[in-house]
Amino acid sequence: MSVFKGEVTTLPPDKSISHRAALIGALAEGVTEITNFSGGFDNQSTLGVLGACGIPLTQEEVPGPWGGTIRRVVIESKGLWSFRPSGAPLECNNSGSTMRMMAGILAGQPFGSELVGDGSLMKRPMQRVAGPLRDMGAGVELSESGTAPMRIAGTKELRPIVYRLPVPSAQVKSLVAFAALHAEGESRIIEPVLSRDHTELMLGLEASEVDGERVIVVPGRRRIEARPFLVPADPSAACFIVALALLAPGSEIMIRDVCLNPTRAAFLDIMIAAGGQITIENRRTVGGEDIGDILARGGGVLEPLSISDPGVVARVIDEIPMLAVLSVFASGSFEVSNAGELRTKECDRLNALAVNLQRLGCLCEESPDGMRVSGGVRAQHSPVVVECFDDHRIAMSFAIAARATGMDIELSDSAVVGVSFPNFFALLESLEV
């Protein structure tokens, strides 16, 4: 069994903040400079779509604070209506974030657009995107199955909206907010369950609690002034490295400058409550976001994880694949409910976990919004081939388990990690003692 030690200063920049910084930069008046922008495939898809819509932008490598280089993106825009027709379908590749949030912006532009993606993205449901945009006055056409291609007939006459999110979704919340920026009047977005709040923080939107629900106020046609953004390290990426340390006794890894926004760092609370040896150091606030360093040590006894609270599930939705694999390998069992959103990600992640954990000898029982895993890992064959289902988080979750435990696991598609974590395998190599 391997041991992993070291300091991580090359974690990918936060994917969610990178998307939003680029989109807000394209809506702002002036020059927006984004330091430490993500080089992952999804974030590059967002830049590609902005460029195709006529938004001037540049991207270059500059020296990083810990050595090496980081990515700086500069976007120049004249405000909300700086977008131009592309003349061709806008290629989002595998990025659901790009497709959904761009739909909100394009709904407010006075021209038609078409959003497309790769085979995986074209199967993902988009009805929740279409509904509020149609209510605001935009035309939205989907396939008969409610998926992309998404054809949008934008308009400068969008109506304000009062929209209650039916399920927690930061992407749907964000696309409604981006559309509402173009509307004539004030819109309100109601969240019964809090989801990640980067969009409202970065736009400076007013949010308050009313009768136990969160209400976000979006003023229409407000001038957005360009400002610089510094993107911290991605907590969803940090989750994999923390799990690596926890699964490998004797390991000790320090991860620098990680986003610790409360809507993103709940996975740490779950791991600590289960017995994980994790401490947070150098906590501070930069650009409205909590940032800190995470120290994770292996060797402790981890209790089985059971996640059911809807608010908690919403805050760890991207980390559930890694939490599931961590719990099964460390304790033999795992349980989650109220997580139906996982079935609409890059793949049906609940089913993907069940398929692969069964290949490892686990007993898995799926429900519409969750799963129960028991029996522990007891693979009968070697190597065990893990089907990645074109999903970076499924691939990385099982890759971490293989590295930490020494189990002979083969990924069906290791290249898919480049969607969010291009240096994933190189980083694992550098940490192994």
UniProtKB/Swiss-Prot annotation:
Pfam families the UniProt entry points to: EPSP_synthase (PF00275)
Annotated localization: Cytoplasm
Protein name according to UniProt: 3-phosphoshikimate 1-carboxyvinyltransferase
Binding site for 3-phosphoshikimate: 15-16, 20, 169, 171, 318, 345
Active-site residues (renumbered): 318
Keywords, in A-Z order: Amino-acid biosynthesis, Aromatic amino acid biosynthesis, Cytoplasm, Transferase
Enzyme category, top tier: transferase
Function: Catalyzes the transfer of the enolpyruvyl moiety of phosphoenolpyruvate (PEP) to the 5-hydroxyl of shikimate-3-phosphate (S3P) to produce enolpyruvyl shikimate-3-phosphate and inorganic phosphate.
